[in-house]
Amino acid sequence: MINDIKKQSEQKMKKSMEALGHAFAKIRTGRANPAILESVMVSYYGTDTPLTQIANVVVEDARTLSVTPWEKNMVPQIEKAILKSDLGLNPSTAGTVIRVPMPALTEETRKELVKTARGEAENTRVAIRNLRRDANADIKTLLKDKEISEDEEKRGLDDIQKLTDKYIAEVDRVLAEKEKDLMAV
């Protein structure tokens, strides 16, 4: 029973880490990363559609993304959608290919992005702690229902704490890496 709680908690903590990874991928570092354009919505036959579903987005070089729409007539809408997004990107069109250069980050922008990254990391830490709280409550319920002994409860709580510490340390490591990435000129 305790093992089930531990496995469930670990799976949820892994999901929290994956969510943090996705959030960090969307924070631009000045280097080209296709994930930056995942949030861009394009009006596709009257429906807002994610850019990644109507075009191929690839890294052309370290500072440029190349967007190739699957339908040539979508080029103007895609360009407009990228301009309207709050990403601060300025696309240029060459035939059916849209090139999106990544602007160099100013010191002020870097600091703002670091703040955003820290906020995302803190949200993930809170989520992990909430998962710990839930797992601990489940273990204490098992003790109250006399399904486990006090020793098993203590061992279970310790294991959940170790799991929490491991994932919080992982959040800190990923955040430090992202900050280093953002502050590199």
Curated annotation (Swiss-Prot):
Matching SUPFAM superfamilies: Ribosome recycling factor, RRF (SSF55194)
Origin: domain of life: Bacteria
First-listed, main subcellular location of the protein, grouped into a coarse class: cytoplasm
Gene Ontology, cellular component aspect: cytosol
Residue ranges that the Swiss-Prot or TrEMBL entry lists as coiled coil: none
GO terms of biological process kind: cytoplasmic translational termination
Subcellular location as annotated: Cytoplasm
Key words, A-Z: Cytoplasm, Protein biosynthesis
Record's function text: Responsible for the release of ribosomes from messenger RNA at the termination of protein biosynthesis. May increase the efficiency of translation by recycling ribosomes from one round of translation to another.
Record family assignment: Belongs to the RRF family.
Name listed for the protein in its UniProt record: Ribosome-recycling factor
Source species of the chain: Hahella chejuensis (strain KCTC 2396)
